[in-house]
């Protein structure tokens, strides 16, 4: 009921599409499920909150959003054809100048995978879907002049440019010579990344999650979870996921809504 009340508050304030805050239903089921919970918190902190404060759209995901009937009437119904319907619908809203509002007090709980291999398959599908949306919607968004459309265009361009970024990074390391590939330099780089990621994860866990929902194994493994996005994104550029496969969710005995 809290989700419906807070969503209705946003509609009464003038929002047409509302995205609530998402948490893992089973954050202590495994380190993988706990990493999803941390990822959602980080995404809200660094993506949704700044965009909400700046008058831009937050990002829809498949769980926990609501839309006004007039939006479907304006867009001619729900017309999505990619593997990432949420991203495609977000792009359609941006093209039409419809802002997606963020309501952090409208909370939904989503059961997450507990195995890393399953997580890789799910996130590969997400990455592939966003690439599909980009190839479908970028030409249309580039012809729009509004801030919402340009912000979405930048979001969809990011995965398209991932291979270029990886090549430029590799080229810069080659130009730096042997010093860039020395064991000491590689170890220092890896240590800095790991400390930064675990530090962020620990802060998110302590600040945003009560003691009963804290999974410290997830904090230790969060750098691996985040690093795995890059190969998944690169793979999605060259190997499309076109068939939906069921993602097992088997953490039902570890639900914690505290």
Residue ranges and their predicted role:
Residues 155-240:
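Membrane-embedded multi-pass helical conduit in multi-pass membrane proteins
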Residues 2-76, 80-82, 124, 131, ...:
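Long helical/loop segments within the catalytic core of UDP-sugar-dependent glycosyltransferases
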Residues 122-133, 217-257:
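Membrane-proximal soluble regions of multi-pass membrane proteins
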Residues 88, 104-130:
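C-terminal catalytic/acceptor-binding lobe
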